[in-house]
Amino acid sequence: MTATVSFGPWLRATLLGWLLGIVLVVALALAGEGLGIGGSQISVGLGMGLGVGLFQERALRFRIGPSRAWLWASALGLTLPFLVVDLARLLGHPIPYSLYATIIAAGVSAGAAQARLLRPLGIAASAWVTASTVGWTAASLMGALADSFTAWSPVRGVPGALLYLGVVAAGGLLLGAATSVPLRTQAYPGSLE
């Protein structure tokens, strides 16, 4: 019996979910433009929440059950801070917006929403929320690093685009590595077999 989630499958699931999330963010943003709600930030949280949530849920399905609870906790938790920003703007009370700060807030809210699903496995809510926050912070820093390339990187064209995408993809790896820690170290013996 093992009490841990294997690092490789969790990392792979999170990375694949991250990559799907990027595609979904773009698709939702384009759909928003078509519907006349361009500039809405909700697509960022919803797209990443659905992408990462779907693949992580698949990795956890034999541990937390076959429900869609993890997917919805991820999607709602990651969407909430972006929704607050959008609603404040719509209500005429815009708040200062930082993509990276909002991603960090989304890590907190997603971690809180997901933590209740991990409680039966023996994973402390504080450990999961911390890991989620650290993971999403690291992912947002990779996005900020990639965004800064246009200012300082001499790499241009296709190589520059590939470098950019590689750095952005590394955000998914860091998210997976950070969130794997409580899964690998805190679960009750046998709860994650």
What residue spans do the PLM features occupy?
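Juxtamembrane/disordered regions of integral membrane proteins
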Residues: 1-193
